[in-house]
Design a protein with these regions (language model features):
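Zn-dependent metallo-beta-lactamase
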Residues: 1-41, 429-445
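Metallo-beta-lactamase
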Residues: 82-142, 244, 251, 260-265, ...
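Pre-active-site segment of Zn-dependent metallo-hydrolases
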Residues: 16-59, 66-71, 127, 151-163, ...
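Feature captures hydrophobic
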Residues: 270-459, 465-472, 478
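Active-site metal-binding motif and surrounding structural segment of the metallo-beta-lactamase
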Residues: 33-80, 160-190, 399, 474-479, ...
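Rieske [2Fe-2S] iron-sulfur-binding domain
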Residues: 65, 439-561
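Cap/insert and terminal regions of metallo-dependent hydrolase folds
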Residues: 78, 155-257
């Protein structure tokens, strides 16, 4: 197996059974904040343009580069698709021209043309942009695990695919914390030191658990070339900086008694066999070392090459074109109204300072209104041009744009609250309902509601929509109006697919008069479903809003039981 490192998390894997292009990233990301480090400007893109397979682990822009994928990768390529509950990644890939997809199941190996592959998918709201994944590859001679920046939880599943000969993984920071927070200097230093230590220790723990013979640090760090962010770079191995480079992690591994790490830079080619891993760099060894020992000089030259590009991107941001308050009120309030568990998790005010516009997201009243100095738990200060951009383009995941850009300031009172950031990545009804359903399923008791003489599970078995809000019942058929999936109340049978089932239970006649409303375990009254427009109870045999078509997929066999 031959593996060309193409920068950041990017790999081009060549085997006798075919090639796989993984997470290619070339263009700046997050409002021109992130650039690949070291630079991959000299990669010959034509050599990686015709892979047999493409693997994009998730939708973060340092992994999913739509401009590169659209302009440089053959659309005859088959995409290896992770098992995500929402089809956001597939939609993004279709938007740039891909039409051939191999859909995988989480943790289930598949053999294609002599290659044995497995994608391990993480699907919690906190996992990437509602999904992150790693790829295991076995070419019959050696096995590798491309973890990139995913955080797998089922390590036994990964072990069953192994043992592994090589392991590619993230070790460095990929977040805005703590730099954007307005902390005192000593506190900032302590938090940065703790974050850096935790990153390195977590990566080392993963290497021990996976147990690969060879370890290659990847998926970071990026570099920051805009003057506004330039100080975030770790120029001198600062123990308080959250962006240590590859050489820092390799030294850390050696200090912990693990000398099996290998440095790869863009253009490096590794040849992996059962007897070793030989890396050839695209430049002399002393030049490779200089990238890291003279990082200030290297980044100064890199910055000079990108200065005009950064200026052009910043000049393109809209300014004064959008009524921010009115737009966010129209956009956010319907979402907040449906975000019962998210709102309960936030349980406070979030203030957004957008220059002349200062507004409150009030998760008590589920309203958006001008800020008049009220107390808050979270405070964000944004360049209003960035918020205008997000509104103009109706960006449904702000984490994947403005937050990862690090182009903001923040304050918070108390501990980190994941519900706040998860709300900002769920700015569509589909995304929000998935997150709400995920939270609900983690509750100790599954909530039921009552309608038309039945007790019914509250969350749709398809993508977890809240059926107390999105169900329409007619002629004994419940239709989830979010995606159009239908279920027979008498049996719970799904009429759209034969691999899902809705829990239903008839209510005894003597109970129905007393049960005018269902009550949640926390005491909140569940409302009856809102009336939804319908054309009748005609049966749909597919989902019209996502990729799922049951006619294309056989019924799944039951498996044995077995920030910051």
């Amino acid at each position: 197996m031959q593996i060309t490192f193409i920068g950041h998390a990017g790999l081009f894997i060549e085997t006798k059974h075919g090639s796989i292009l993984c997470d290619p990233w070339f263009n700046s990301a997050y409002f021109a904040s992130w650039f690949p480090f070291p630079s991959n400007e000299d990669i010959d893109r034509s050599k990686i343009a015709n892979p047999d397979y493409l693997f994009v682990s998730h939708l973060h822009h340092d992994h999913f580069d739509p401009e590169f994928l659209r302009d440089h990768v053959s659309k005859d390529t088959t995409v290896l698709l992770p098992d995500y509950p929402l089809d956001l990644l597939e939609r993004g890939l279709r938007d740039v021209g891909f039409t051939k997809f191999l859909r995988t199941k989480n943790g289930v190996p598949v053999t294609v043309d002599g290659l044995r592959l497995m994608i391990s998918a993480a699907v919690a709201p906190t996992d990437g942009p509602l999904g992150d994944s790693g790829l295991s590859v076995d070419d019959g001679e050696v096995r590798i695990f491309d973890q990139n920046d995913s955080r797998p939880v089922d390590l036994d599943m990964l072990a069953d695919f192994g043992p592994y000969d090589a392991h590619f993984l993230q070790f460095s920071g990929a977040i805005w914390y703590p730099m954007v927070y307005l902390y005192p200097e000593k506190m900032m230093d302590a938090l940065g030191r703790k974050k850096r230590d935790n990153e390195l220790a977590r990566a080392l723990r993963f290497t021990k658990e996976i147990g690969a013979t060879h370890i290659i640090p990847s998926a970071g760090p990026p570099c920051f070339l805009d003057d506004d962010l330039y100080g975030f770079n770790d120029f001198d191995r600062d123990p308080k900086n959250i962006f240590p480079d590859q050489t820092v992690f390799l030294d850390y591994m050696r200090a912990q008694g693990h000398p099996n790490g290998h440095l790869m830079i863009p253009g490096s080619v590794g040849t992996l066999t059962k007897t070793g891993y030989i890396v050839e760099h695209p430049m002399p060894e002393e030049q490779v070392r200089a990238i890291f020992t003279d990082k200030r000089g290297y980044l100064a030259q890199y910055q000079a090459r990108k200065r005009d590009e950064i200026a052009a991107i910043k000049a393109s941001w809209p300014r004064g074109q959008v009524d921010i308050l009115a737009s966010l009120r129209e956009w956010f309030e319907p979402l907040m109204d449906k975000a019962d568990l998210t709102a309960a998790g936030i349980n406070s005010l979030v203030v957004m300072d957008c220059g002349e516009t200062k507004l409150v997201l009030d998760f008590h009243t589920r309203k958006v209104y001008p800020w008049q100095g009220e107390e808050y738990d979270y405070f964000f200060r944004f360049d209003p041009a960035l918020i205008e951009y997000l509104i103009v383009h109706h960006v449904e995941d702000w984490i994947n744009e403005v937050f990862l850009s690090c182009r903001f300031q923040a304050e918070r009172k108390g501990a980190y609250n994941e519900y706040v950031y998860n709300f900002f990545k769920c700015l569509s009804m589909e995304r929000l309902q998935y997150a709400e359903g995920y939270y609900a399923e983690k509750a100790p008791v599954q909530t039921l509601w009552e309608s038309d003489g039945y007790r019914i599970q509250r969350r749709c078995p398809h993508l977890k929509a809240d059926l107390t809000r999105f169900a329409h019942i007619e002629d004994g058929v419940l239709t989830c109006t979010l995606h159009g999936w239908q279920f027979e109340l008498a049996t719970g049978r799904c009429l759209t697919s034969d691999d899902r089932r809705l829990y239903t239970q008839p209510i005894a006649m003597d109970e129905r008069n007393e049960a005018s409303a269902a009550t949640r375990s926390d005491g909140a009254v569940l409302h009856t479903p809102m009336e939804q427009p319908t054309s009748g109870a005609s049966i749909r045999d597919r989902c019209y809003d996502c990729w799922y078509d049951p006619k294309k997929f056989p019924t799944r066999k039951k498996q044995p039981v077995g920030e910051e």
